Each structure stands twice: as C-alpha cells, then as structure tokens.
UniProtKB/Swiss-Prot annotation:
Record InterPro entries: Ubiquitin-like_domsf, UFM1
Highest taxon, organism lineage: Eukaryota
One Pfam family it belongs to: Ufm1
Family: Belongs to the UFM1 family.
Name of protein: Ubiquitin-fold modifier 1
Gene assigned in the entry: ufm-1
Origin species: Caenorhabditis briggsae
Cross-link type Glycyl lysine isopeptide (Gly-Lys) (interchain with K-? in acceptor proteins), residue numbers: G91
Transmembrane segments: none
BP GO annotations: protein ufmylation; response to endoplasmic reticulum stress; reticulophagy
One annotated Gene Ontology cellular component of this protein: nucleus
Propeptide position ranges: 92-93
Signal peptide: none
Lineage: Eukaryota, Metazoa, Ecdysozoa, Nematoda, Chromadorea
Keywords: Isopeptide bond, Ubl conjugation, Ubl conjugation pathway
Quaternary structure and partners: Interacts with odr-8; leading to deufmylation.
Length: 93
C-alpha cells in the first residue's frame, strides 16, 4: 500500500471575483487538488447567486479557462486569482 492513501488530500485556494458587480466582491475557496473544476465553478456561481450554467471563469488577463480539468491543474496553469463572469448579460434578443 502507498503512504499517500492515508495522507490528507492536498488543497488549492482560489480567490474568485465577480466581475459583473461594480463592487467586485470576491470569495476565497479552498478545494482538494483533485476536485473537478466544474464543481468549483458551480459552487462559486451559487455563492454569488448567479446561474452556473451560463457563467464562465477567466484569468485576470481575460483568458478563458476550460473547466473540464482538475482544480490542481487550473491552479498550476493559471494561479489563484480568477474572475467569474455571468454570461446571461452577453448577447440576447
């Protein structure tokens, strides 16, 4: 047996800012490295009371992030400071 099985799961911490609010509120979330980032996106959207299905996560530089990867991968590639954009205000009829 590997010693890793009994060790606590490593966590990563994200500071997620809601860009649609002029006050730029933010939430700090600590999640296991192996957590699917889609779950992090869904939880952050619920915390800000915006629809998760129409929200996106971007970096502070404006680069879109594909949420179909682990939280650990996102952290390593993009860092801890991210932005949540509710896309319900984009486009429309």
């Amino acid at each position: 047996m590997s010693g890793e099985a009994s060790a606590p799961a490593a966590k990563v911490t994200f500071k997620i800012t809601l860009t649609s609010d002029p006050k730029l509120p933010f939430k700090v979330l600590s999640v296991p490295e192996a957590a699917p980032f889609t779950s992090v996106l869904r939880y952050a959207a619920e915390e800000f009371k915006v629809p998760a299905a129409t929200s996106a996560i971007i970096t502070n530089d404006g680069v879109g992030i594909n949420p179909a990867q682990s939280a650990g991968n996102i952290f390593l590639k993009h860092g801890s400071e991210l932005r949540l954009i509710p896309r319900d205000r984009v486009g429309g009829f």
